[in-house]
Amino acid sequence: MAASGRIAFLEGTYPSANMALVRGERPVLVDTGYGSDLPRTERLLRENGTPPERLALIVNTHYHCDHVGGNSGLQNRYGLPVAAHRWEAAMVNHRDREACSAEWLDQPVEAYAVDRPLSEGDELDTGGVTLRVLHTPGHTLGHISLWAPEEGVLILGDAVHGDDVAWINPFREGAGAMVRALETLERLSRLPARRALSGHGPPIEDPRAAFDAARRRYERWLREPEKACWHACKRIFAYALMIYGGLGRDEVRPYLLRCPWFHDFAKNGLGLRPEEFVGPLLDEMLRSGAAGWREGRLVALAPHNPPPEGWLTGPARPRDWPEPGRRGA
């Protein structure tokens, strides 16, 4: 699906996020999906006239596994450089255990390096489209979006979704994450965008209306922060069910009780002992339709492509990654 003649929207299916292909003499791929979906990513690129070996640069909107999971394979197979906000670049390249929130979220990410740290106001020229880097914190501190003024297109990442809002993580992204998300929305709403591409959901045909809806929801969460906690927990747990192919009845409780995100939201977000939160979260997953029991397993009900067993080929936690080799910028 095209966003404009020079920016192609590559729709992702969970566990992958959407991607964008920005065409030109030096084509750019924005985000790379989940690691197990790399063959599909390569196929989408070829179908859109840009085989992966022709890419000049990968740009990550932020470092969660559904947006950076294909980095490792694309770097190893094609030697492609990666660009990301300088704060997240430093964490990735230093193999910081907090990088990608991989351990906190229990989400695997294979090793990659960031070759080009980005800052607010940087410009990327594909030879056909100029992309302006916007620092858009909220979902993560180092989140960026890309503005193509000549196209009137915003590439949002998870700053705003086509059919939802991004979950907020005050425990790893700071107590002011919600306020930063609101400031990001205010800033984005001032741009004359005619179309916006988000990390999840369909293209946004009325960006201003989407920003207004997201702002109202975040403002409500500021007044009722427990709603933000429930939203985040359902999103994170549903994603875990997707990437692990569901959980058996006797696996749900032990799994949740070993997850750092579950402990933080239970104790610090909702004032509950983690053991007290297992039942209510499971009940809400079932009530809301986020998950259901199928043949004795709790599975996510949103459309998704379960990763095949054995797809990981290397360490899946940044602290275990090998040191990055030298790469050209």
Regions found by a protein language model. Give the residues of each.
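Conserved beta-strand hairpin/beta-sheet module of binuclear metal-dependent hydrolase folds
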Residues: 1-48, 52, 145-157, 162
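Short Pro/Gly-enriched beta-strand edge/turn motifs at strand-loop
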Residues: 1-7, 102-106, 127-129
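Active-site HxH/HxHxD metal-binding segment of metal-dependent hydrolases
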Residues: 34-39, 46-126
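A structural signal for the main folded, soluble domain(s) of proteins
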Residues: 5, 55-56, 69, 74, ...
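Metallo-beta-lactamase
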Residues: 34-36, 123, 130-137, 141-226
